[in-house]
């Protein structure tokens, strides 16, 4: 099932105090194969130039996610978020980034996918299909939304799965997400936490610790 050559990358989302060029050069010297970033439009050209200069793979762009819940509602707010994510897809294509990591939902109170949401995500899927960008839908809270997207768009070439080990432990309560979506695996996030620490799941459980610590 999982055949091929795999490359190991690391988050380049900031915090080092280094320039993009110096940061990527350091990762290359240490032995990383690639890196992923957030969607910082002011630095996209720098990321691409550094990846090419040091023969590194720019593996993915993590799309904005704080407003994704509005995509499941009718109306302008959801359409605006959808438009933003479509632009992120276009930037992935323009800067030769093969995967856009995307959250299907954010929040812990709602659990009902809607037709409006599926239409909005359908616009993103169609754009990614046309541009050859793989969408790595991440296992986060709200598994119902991930399931609905996979059911609706199963036959689309852009539909992919980004497996987050830490999210599986806390947000998914240890459920085997690879058993559900491993056939579409296109990206991974390896990190750790201590599981659900209270009666209810909350984002503070998602500690993003180094694995094994």
Protein language model regions, located:
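Active-site-proximal loop/turn and secondary-structure-junction residues that shape catalytic pockets
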Residues: 14-16, 41-43, 62-67, 104-108, ...
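Acidic/histidine-rich catalytic cores of soluble enzymes
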Residues: 122-212
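Active-site-adjacent beta->alpha loops and helix N-cap segments on the catalytic face
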Residues: 41-50, 109-118, 144
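N-terminal pre-domain/capping segments
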Residues: 1-87, 93
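An active-site-proximal structural segment forming one wall of the substrate-binding cleft
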Residues: 75-99, 117-131
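Active-site groove signature of glycoside hydrolases
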Residues: 88, 92-112, 131, 136-140
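Hydrophobic faces of well-ordered beta-strands that scaffold small-molecule active sites
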Residues: 6-12, 35-37, 58-63, 100-102, ...
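Surface-exposed, active-site-proximal loop segments in enzymatic domains
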Residues: 64-83, 106-116, 200-210
């Amino acid at each position: 099932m999982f055949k091929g050559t795999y490359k190991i990358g690391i988050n380049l989302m900031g915090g080092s105090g280094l320039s993009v060029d110096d940061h990527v050069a350091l990762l290359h010297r240490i032995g990383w194969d690639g890196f992923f970033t957030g969607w910082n439009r002011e630095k996209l050209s720098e990321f691409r130039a550094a990846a090419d200069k040091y023969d590194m793979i720019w593996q993915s762009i993590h799309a904005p996610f704080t407003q994704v819940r509005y995509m499941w509602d009718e109306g302008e707010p959801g359409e605006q978020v959808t438009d933003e994510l479509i632009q992120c897809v276009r930037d992935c294509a323009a800067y030769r980034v093969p995967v856009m990591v995307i959250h299907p939902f954010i929040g812990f109170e709602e659990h009902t996918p809607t037709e409006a949401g599926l239409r909005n995500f359908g616009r993103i899927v169609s754009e990614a299909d046309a541009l050859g960008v793989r969408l790595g839908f991440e296992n986060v809270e709200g598994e119902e939304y991930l399931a609905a997207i996979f059911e609706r768009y199963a036959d689309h070439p852009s539909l992919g799965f980004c497996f987050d080990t830490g999210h599986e432990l806390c947000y998914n309560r240890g459920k085997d997400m690879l058993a559900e979506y491993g056939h579409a695996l296109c990206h991974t996030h390896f990190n750790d936490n201590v599981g659900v620490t209270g009666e209810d799941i909350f984002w503070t459980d998602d500690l993003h610790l180094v694995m094994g610590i």
